[in-house]
Amino acid sequence: MAAALRFCLLLSALFVAGGAFAAPADLVEQGRRIYTEGISVSGQPLQASRDGGAILSGPQAACIGCHRASGMGSVEGSQPVSPIGQRYLFATVGDLVMANMDGRRGKTLNQTHAPYTDEGLAMALRQGVGISGRSLSTVMPHFVLDEQDLAAIKAYLQQLSAGYSPGVSKEVIRFATVITPDVSEARRAVFKTMLQSALTAKNSSTSPRKRYMSSAASFATQTERRWDVQVWELTGEAQTWGAQLEAHYREWPVFALLSGISDTTWAPVDAFCAAQKVPCWFPSVAVPSTGDAAYGLYFSRGVALDARVLASYLQDANGEAAPKRLLQVQGGGSAELAARSFGQSLMVKGRTVQTITVDSDVAKGRNELRAALQSARPGDAMALWLSAEQLRWLDGIQPPAGVQFYASASLAQLGTPQWIAPSWKPVLQVVYPYALPQARQANLAYLHSWLKLRNIPLVDEVLQSELFFSLNLMTDTLQDMLDNLYRDYLIERTEDMLGRREASKVEQENRDRITLGRLGREAVLAEGVRGGAVGDATSPLAAQQRAFGLGESGGTTVYPHLSLGPTQRFASRGAYIVRFSQGNIDTLTAQSDWIVP
């Protein structure tokens, strides 16, 4: 990383005159390999040296480590790394653009600079001498570059982030949101209602007559844009979704897929995003990407995370809590991934898991589930990888005594209250990737207020919290990006700012709650009396009241904490094991600490 920083610092000083040009594709590709892989045109590792005699080679010398794929820079330790994309590195004198490499500092204009000649560029890269004749940073390595290497890296940099990504114009940013055919009508309807309400408010605030100053930099540079969002509702089998997405995209290219919702697989959507290099922005899905998710940003790994958390929990159990046998029942679809992840995680630990598959047909599946439950013996642990509908099959089946039973909140949508057979509530434990109830209510006070003001019903708290967060985070990130609207940069800014943004939002909301608690408590309670909602523990007003009493929240979503880092794609990485309280069968109580497998 230090070596990459040295190359980054060198390139940060190179500002070359001229606009983008069409270099031969093979030359640009050779430059890409130098930039991203540290491989010279000859195919050999890029070589460099620095003061003290240290030799740098190959990936150590590649600048992508700190300038990132967008060329928009970053921060390494306390050292900001300047942008080197076409608009920055090759800007002419007086062509000033603004960027924000370090979220801890203010946004800054790029430096006014004289254009670099080819000779000046070569001297800077090879000898560490800038166009002014002054030596560049002492940590700058001197690169071994022949004329072909110099031509290639220049060609690559001249096209890097040279113009807006597809879906962006001076006035508008295009988005799409994807809904897969398996989503219930109730969830589909509230998702679309919330999206439309938020979109109307967003575009109203950025209209010329109603524009407000979201930030001094964005106001001064007039970089606020109207959002244009299409809803792409897929049909048919999952193997046809890729072609449907490609057809939508050909007709209407978008900057990113904004949120989205699916109750089964998301793999075709993630594959489309990777192929087209379109960011997939925090969709509400039980099964996100099963691959590298190069262009996907997700809340968590979904059911796969639940499975790994449960495997870790059971593996660490000691004494009487340690299960004699491990069994799992899977109901098909998303449950197959959970069962596979659970089995693989325990296999690594030397444990075997007996897997029982139940049919999707209600009558047949229920009989198979009954038989599977009867096969369990005292001291066993059984994971029930079942959907919310399949969990209802437990009604009328008595749980075998002495068996530990576990369900997945992600798979069975238990983040929102679901009906569970009364005889099962005392024995069923749940892998719960969300904040515990008290903290969760404080975290979601703003969401509940937003819904109440717009008369939008609370249908699925997890889904609605995720959509609310996704829309707000996109707004904040675009404000931070200003006019540098490149897809890679959208992902990079989110990797860098998410954790800090969450901490800042929490602090702001806690201050607001204190103020409201002092000035508005009586008014809120009076409104509740008039509206008859004070006694309703699920009402938005009750959530506000609990927030006042709780004081500080720890996040802004249903998740305890969200953060990302370079190349990280899943913002929440753990879960609790919870069970229904004995004293209050509708209250969840933690059985474990936050488990990160």
Cite the ranges covered by each PLM segment.
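Segments of small-molecule ligand-sensing domains
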Residues: W450-S465, T475-T589
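Electrostatic cytochrome c docking/interface patches
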Residues: A22-S57, N110
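Gly/Gly-Pro-rich "capping" loops immediately C-terminal to redox-active cysteine motifs
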Residues: A48-D118, V139-L145
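Beta-alpha junction/loop-to-helix N-cap segments that form part of ligand/metal-binding clefts
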Residues: K170-V172, R187-T193, S205-G291, S360-A363, ...
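Extracytoplasmic ligand/sensor domains, especially the bilobed periplasmic-binding protein
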Residues: E251-I356, G402-V430
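Extracellular/periplasmic periplasmic-binding protein-like sensory domains
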Residues: G296-S300, L394-F469
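Detector for the c-type heme attachment site
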Residues: T36-I39, G65-M72, R126-G130, Q158-Q159
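C-terminal capping alpha-helices of c-type cytochrome domains
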Residues: P24, Q30, P115-I131, P141-P166
